[in-house]
Amino acid sequence: MILEVLNASSADEVFFVPNISEQQVADSGHGDLVDVEDVLVQGRRGAARVGPALELDGAEIDALGAWDIAEVLTRLTEALELSEQPMVIINGKIVASAGVFSSFPPDAIMRIEVLPPAATALYGGVSGQTVINIVLQRRYASYDGRIVLSRPTQGGASSLSSDLRRSSIVGDRAYILSLRTSHDDPLRAGERDRMTLGGGSEDHEVTLRPSTDLISANASVTLPFRELSGVFNLNAQTRESRSVANYAGEIVESHRRNKSLGGSAGISGSAYGWSLQGNLNGQVSRAQEDGFQEGHSENQSLGLNLSGSRSLIDLPMGGVVTNLSGNLMTSRSTVDRAQSRATSVFYTREGRGTLAIPLSKANDEAMFGRLVGDLQIVMGGGVRLNTGGGGEEVSGGLDWAPRKGLRLSSAWTASTDSVSDLLRSEPSYHGAPRVAFDFRAGEAVEIVPILGGNPDLKPPRSERFSLNAALGPFTSWGMAGNFGYQKTEATNGIGVLPDLTSDVEAAFPERFERDGNGRLISVDLRPLNLSSSLMEGLTTAVNFSLPRPQGAASNEAMVARFSLNYNLQLRNTVALLEGRPELDRLKGDGGGVSRQSLRAALDAKRGRWGLNASARWQDGYRTRRNGGRDDQADLVLKSFAAVDLKLTFQMSSSSIRASASSEEGGPRRRSSSLQVNLEVENLFDARPEARLGDGSAAPGYGRDAQDLIGRVVRLTLQRRF
């Protein structure tokens, strides 16, 4: 007898079990005895604990035109309108460090599963986070290289980069070696037609964008140890940048050098019914600056992450699953200036746990299950202790699938979040000059911003609530939609100055530097704590793909996936300091924001040709000079739209064939011939436009004022060796 699993693909695992005896079946403890001679069992390799809400096969992944898995995840995050970075699992399991797989080529992926909200608690994710399951090829190997040349059509700021990569997967063993180099030419003031701004860059040697050189290397390996799996990573990077600025009438040359070395070691496996993961990571970095201020800084950090999950109780409707996790992190930062030396030590200790309880399971046998469908509640909590104080986290959620193709979910979280090491310890430095509208003087000026971290940041406290409805997929087009509502309230939220309005300068006068004539020359844009904020909005995401013939190879059938996202802000308010009035940013107080935004994308591939196109639009908005009332000196920005386009051509046909089991590369989806990519960002060279409240032209919003780059053409040559 042969037992078939419906919808099983050629990539599924197949086990052949001959002549199973009665005693063997009874001893296995897997239920009632079935007397069969031979059994063929088929099951999906790498399947997650729950079925996917959305699945992309190899052809759809290749149509994204991505260089690596990290770019694939970025594209998915945009298409699905995810508010947070997704939690990534590999082959249906949590691994110690999923990030080590981010540099692998996209065709190392067999399929991608976007899991429903119920998976978040099952895998220990943060409330509201989406879980993405990446199923890798069983056997895979490649040598890849590419050269990328980009240049604005207006000239200047050319960029040249190169990548080399060696990757391999053999069962549970995997490794990758990668090297990247890049050089960015400076953009000089003389290369742009800009009107002279008060106190601005009249010298043609002044750089509007710095020159930058970067070299980075990465090595990762994953190895099995009996029932365990270990992962090791080592990465290094060096970066240098040079710039020339006009600061208070003086020409200042600046040179920054950054070097970093990082590594991690992790292990995952099962013991005593628990699925366990642990990861130890560390990094050392050094930065040096000459020019605006002489000095150097050093930073060392060490972190340990532990997590575990297991099923506590098996109920008729499913198992009660718990997830526990802990995080220990410490860092030391030293900043050495010409006349001072300061050392800071930061630490974070946190632990959290979740409990997922199934209340109902859809089936045809129980009346309650038929009426209610799948229903699960999630409860969670945590404690956090760090340098700035401590806090707690409480969360809850509900996931309900009353019918096939319909899933409703909600999530609520109240927490005190930790402050990242980078936000606190990064040394301050002067960035590239930029044009800003000075509301106090009513003129456009060129300022030199102060960037970096802020050691005085306090842990923010936030409360989040979300509702989401997911529909589909329906029809042969795989039509699917997500409709969501989000509300976030924060106290001591971390942000930057919203805009350079009178309200903002009155609240933070120490962050504005003016010369003897009162002209604005520099603004401190390092992160700071805002007293309180409230954001409320709606999101909509629709995805569908062109139907393909069953069994057609990806080079024989057209692959096309469409996505459409729409965002609407209902409320956006902020109080800069305690005791100061609340500013309504949708009305333009304290720096206006767009109420609506829209994004559409198309990813298509047929044979040797590929097309990736996207269009984005955001509504216009007003920024008030003084909060609470419109003024003729307000800044009114027009709606903005831009289109990006990418064409891909493979020099020879990339026929897909199923490799023999002894062949190292596995099923091939990419040939070794040269691939040429031509990409145009901002196809129609759109630039921000604005006017004043009285209808006159706004200073600082000429063609080359706010957007110095405009349309960029990028040519990529890549090949598999």
Regions found by a protein language model. Give the residues of each.
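Transmembrane beta-barrel wall of Gram-negative outer-membrane proteins
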Residues: 144, 154-266, 270-273, 280-283
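Outer-membrane beta-barrel transmembrane domain signature of Gram-negative proteins
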Residues: 282, 287-377, 577-603, 614
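A beta-strand signature from Gram-negative outer-membrane beta-barrel systems
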Residues: 95, 104-142
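C-terminal beta-signal and adjacent terminal beta-strands/loops
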Residues: 61, 616-626, 650-721
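Short, acidic, small-residue-rich periplasmic hinge/interaction motif at the N-terminus
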Residues: 12-62
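Short loop/turn motifs that connect adjacent beta-strands in outer-membrane beta-barrel proteins
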Residues: 139-142, 171-172, 224-229, 269-277, ...
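Outer-membrane beta-barrel signature, preferentially recognizing the C-terminal barrel domain
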Residues: 417-482, 518, 523-538, 545-548, ...
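Gram-negative outer-membrane beta-barrel transporters
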Residues: 486-497, 502-625
